[in-house]
Amino acid sequence: MSEQPTRFLTGITPSGTPHLGNYAGMMRPAIAATRTAGCENFYFLADYHALIKTQDPARIHRCTLEIAASWLACGLDPEKVTFYRQSDIPEITELTWFLTCVTGKGLLNRAHAYKAAQDKNQEAGRDLDDGVNAGLFMYPVLMAADILIFNAHKVPVGRDQIQHIEMARDIAASFNHLYGEHFTLPEALVEEQVATLAGLDGRKMSKSYDNTIPLFAPPAQLKKLIGSIVTDSRAPGEAKAVEGSALFQLYQAFATPEEVAAMAQAYADGIAWGEAKERLFACIDREIAPMRARYEDLMAHPEKVEAILQAGAEKARALAVPLVQRLRHAVGLRRLTEQAVSTDKSKSAKLALPSFKQYREKDGKFYFKLVDAQGKLLLQSLGLDSPRDAGHAIAQLQQQGAAALAALAPQIEALSDAARAEALQALAQLQAYAASE
C-alpha cells in the first residue's frame, strides 16, 4: 500500500498587502516548502476569522483580494497546492457546530486570546467580558474545524498558536471517543528560526511600528523608503560595522552569498551610505519586480483570482463533503429510513464496545491504547514519533485484527497470553460492529 502523503495546512488571515518582512520571514520559505516531495499542502484565506476583529465589509473584501493576489504573485502554485477561501467551504461551519457540541466551556475559558482580553479588562477595571464577542471565545473551535475538515497532519504555526493546535487535538479526541475514529490528531509544526527583518528605523519590521516597506511598492517609492533607512554618521571612506546594520540585514535577505560577502568587504572599505542604499535597492527590486508585475495584473483582474479560489474550493470540497456526510451519519443526523434499519445500534450499544485512545505524553511521543467498555487497559503502545503513526497503527488494528497485532508487536508493550486473548477478543468485537454498520 502506498504511503499517504503528509498533509500540511496553513491559514492566512486577510490583513492587507504584506511587507518585505512578511515575505522574507514567512511567505518565501512557505512557498518553497510546497515543492517538497511527499507533502500535500492546503492554503486558505481565513476570512471567517477576520470577521472577529473587523466589521468593515469593504476592508474584508479588499484585503481578501490583496492577500490572495500577493501569495499567487509570490509563486504559490494552485496546481501544486489546494488554495481556497474559508467561506467557500460550508462544511467548515457545519463541522464547527459538531465540534462545539463536544467541546467543554472550561477548555475555551483557558484559551490565551480570551484570557488576555479578560486580563486587559481586569486591569482597566471593566467587566471581564467587556468588548469580547462570541467569535473570539469560539475561535479555537473554528480553527479546529479548519484543520480537522481535511485531517491535516501538521499545521505550521508560531509559538503563540501552539495552544490552539493542542486544543484541536483535544476536541478531535473527544469526538473520536464519542463517535469513533474519524479524525487524525494534528501536530503543531513550529519554525524555531523565523527570519525577521529590520525596519526603516532599525527595529523589527512591523505595521505596528510604522516602519515597513510594502512588498509591492512601486520602484520610486521603494527607492525613497530605502533612502530613509536609518544609518549612523560614519562618512565615506570610514569603515562601517555590518553587525546591527538594518541596511546590511535587508541586503542579506535578498542577495546571493557572493554579493553578501562583497557588501561586507565594502562596509570594511568604507562604502558611502548612499551607494550602499543604491545596491540594496537594485538587489531587492531584482527579486520583487517580476512579482510586482504579476501582483498588479491580478489586482487589475480580480476575476482571475476568483477563478483560482473557486477551483481550489472545488478541490477542497471533494474531501470535505464526504467527510461531513460520514460525520452526519455518525452523530445521528440520518434519513429516518436509515434510523429504522439501525435501531438495534443504540448509543448504549456503541458505548459498550472497546475503544482506542490516542494521546501525547510529556516526553513528546505519541501513544495509543485499547480499553474495554469499563476502561480496563487491554493493549498499550510504545512511544511513536507522530500522531500519524499512531493513527495508522489504530486503523490497522481495527481493520486487520490478529494479523495487525502480530505485525505491530514491536510498537506495543508485551502481552501475556491471557492479555493477548482479551485484546484479540476486543478487536474482533470492533470488526464485527464495523461490518454490521
Residue ranges and their predicted role:
Residues 33-37, 388, 405-409:
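Glycine/alanine-rich phosphate-binding loops at beta-alpha junctions
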Residues 2-144:
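N-terminal Rossmann-like or analogous alpha/beta NTP/dinucleotide-binding catalytic cores
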Residues 376-387:
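A short, exposed loop/beta-hairpin motif centered on an aromatic-Gly-Thr core
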Residues 365-370, 397, 426, 430:
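Short, structured motif recognition centered on aromatic/hydrophobic residues
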